[in-house]
C-alpha cells in the first residue's frame, strides 16, 4: 500500500509539474516579425537584408510544434502560377521557412527542424536565445553561417505577439 501511494504521489507530482510548465510557457502563440538584423562576427557590422517592410510569422503550439516563415521586402510576383527558373531562384532566395518541434528552458529555445526551405537545415537543431519584454520577443541565434551570404554571425529578430482573432 505504501509503495502504491508513493508511486501515485510521484506520478501526480510529475503530471502537475508538466501541466504547470505547459501553462506557463511564455512563447505559446503566434508572433509577427518586427525587426530582423544580421550581425557579422568578423566586423560587428549590423544590417537588415530583408528590407523595411519585413514579413514573417513564428508560432509555438502547446503540443511542442513550431513553425517560422520569413520573406523579404518587395518580392516580385512571378508572371504566372508556374514561375520561370529565374523567378523560382529569386523566390527561393528571398525566404526562410521551417517547422518542427521545440524544447526550451528559461533562456533558450531549440528548434528541432523536421522540414525546411533549405534541405540542409532539415534534421538539425537550431539554437535560439530569447528574451521577453511585454508583447515583444527578441530571439538571437547561436553563431552560424548565414544561409543567404555565407558570412559567420548571428541573427537578432524581434517579434510582436499576435492577438487572437
Regions found by a protein language model. Name each.
Residues 1-10:
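Bacterial N-terminal signal peptides that target proteins for export
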Residues 15, 19-165:
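Lipid interaction determinants
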